[in-house]
A protein has these predicted regions:
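Short coil/linker segments at helix-helix boundaries
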Residues: 1-11, 15-26, 46-70
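Acidic, serine/threonine/proline-rich low-complexity intrinsically disordered regions
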Residues: 51-64, 99-110, 153-154
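Amphipathic alpha-helical repeat scaffolds of TPR domains
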Residues: 3, 10, 14-17, 32-53, ...
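TPR/TPR-like (Sel1-like) alpha-helical repeat modules
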Residues: 105-122
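A contiguous pocket-lining binding segment that forms or flanks enzyme active sites
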Residues: 56-81, 85-99
Length: 154
């Protein structure tokens, strides 16, 4: 039963990647949309990593990391720090590094940096825009707290 579900998930992920690669990413109307679609693609590779093993895990994790890294670098250049897509990307990328790749220090540093940067500019940010994204900011902060406690225990 487990294998059947995993096969079905892989087929769904392939379909999603196909739609993203064929239609959404190449036809994105702006850079923010392109980053969002790339993030989704990386997210689905991350989901695949949750049950993949061996070579399949290596391929899925390599693809996820490559795409997360590419869109994270692009987002840093063109999206404001408080942008919902950029914050969601930072959250998901850091979770990938922490949970999937077991790069706890890198994940902690990434989350801490973005949280620290957003706290520095929060007063300057248009209040409405910032409040729309407070949940993402709070999730990043919660991960920092959890990861900090886990690191202290090690």
């Amino acid at each position: 039963m487990k294998e059947k579900i995993q096969l079905e998930l892989k087929a769904i992920f392939q379909d999603i990647h196909s739609v993203l690669d064929r239609y959404l990413i190449p036809n994105a109307q702006d850079s923010e949309s392109k980053i969002l679609y790339m993030k989704l693609k990386a997210d689905f590779f991350r989901y695949h990593c949750e049950f993949a093993e061996g070579k399949e895990f290596e391929e899925a994790s390599d693809n996820a990391r490559k795409i997360y890294k590419e869109c994270f670098e692009l987002a840093e250049k063109i999206l404001p720090l408080y942008n919902e897509v950029r914050l969601g990307l930072a959250l998901n990328y850091s979770v990938f590094e922490y949970d999937i790749m077991d790069n706890k220090n890198d994940a902690f540093d990434m989350a801490s940096k973005i949280y620290g940067d957003i706290m520095k500019i929060l007063d300057d940010v248009e209040k409405k825009r910032a409040s729309d994204n407070l949940l993402l900011i709070q999730l990043i902060k919660e991960n920092i707290n959890i990861w900090s406690n886990e690191t202290d225990e090690d």
